[in-house]
Amino acid sequence: MIKLVLIRHGQSLWNLENRFTGWTDVDLSEKGLSEAREAGAILKKNGYTFDVAYTSVLKRAIRTLWIVLHEMDLAWVPVHKCWKLNERHYGALQGLNKDETAQKYGEEQVHIWRRSIDVRPPALTEDDPRYEMNDPRYKALKKGEFPLTECLVDTEKRVLAYWHSEIAPKLKNGNKVIISSHGNTIRSLVKYLDNLSSDGVVSLNIPTSIPLVYELDENLRPIRHYYLSMDGEVPEGEIPKHITF
């Protein structure tokens, strides 16, 4: 049996401020740092270890992974960073307060932008100071690859491309893998692994910094999945307590 651990980064400063974050490189809040330490302690207590780790190029996911591995005495584990594991790009909404945006555009419209799978928010323009194309971490991207906005389908496409090319082969070769990433990135993976319908993924929420374990067969088909706590598996249907959506 193959085990895969997914973890959404701890609470970020913009989670705390209720802002759309997307590709903006925001760090963890104090609560987020504490959540990451707790996640590492949970994994260590439950006897987990890893051979390889994957994360995005955004510091909130990177720092969460560093802290988790440090708490587990696994700082030596190879870490692979890739922009394809970044959060969904929220376009012109990035940096805006979610409540204020709902007041401006209407709650229904903002709900559609956030939760539908195929509707993109308004795009950034290339002259917008939030446009990240010139950031050195993205120098390998061609202009047509760089998003100005994304829907969940767009996010899923790049996430699964990286899954099939890099992560799945490692799992099939017997490596113990952890992925530290973002809410919509993990939603995309869960949608794929569990073969969720569009309606099923709309209501799917991923809590911050609580390990989500997938047990997979040799073809990487899920046998079952569960969240972990200090006491072991969280019973089916119970939502972990600290959640930042």
Swiss-Prot record:
Q: Which NCBIfam families match?
A: pgm_1, PRK14115.1
Q: Which GO terms of type biological process are on file?
A: gluconeogenesis; glycolytic process
- Pfam families, per this entry? His_Phos_1 (PF00300)
Provide the site residues for: Transition state stabilizer.
H182
| UniProt-listed SMART domains | PGAM
Domain of life from the UniProt record: Bacteria
Active-site residues annotated for this sequence: H9 (tele-phosphohistidine intermediate), E87 (proton donor/acceptor)
Keyword field: Gluconeogenesis, Glycolysis, Isomerase
Family of this protein: Belongs to the phosphoglycerate mutase family. BPG-dependent PGAM subfamily.
Lineage of this protein's species?
A: Bacteria, Bacillati, Bacillota, Bacilli, Bacillales
Q: What is this protein called?
A: 2,3-bisphosphoglycerate-dependent phosphoglycerate mutase
Q: Gene that codes for this? A: gpmA
HAMAP family in UniProt: PGAM_GpmA
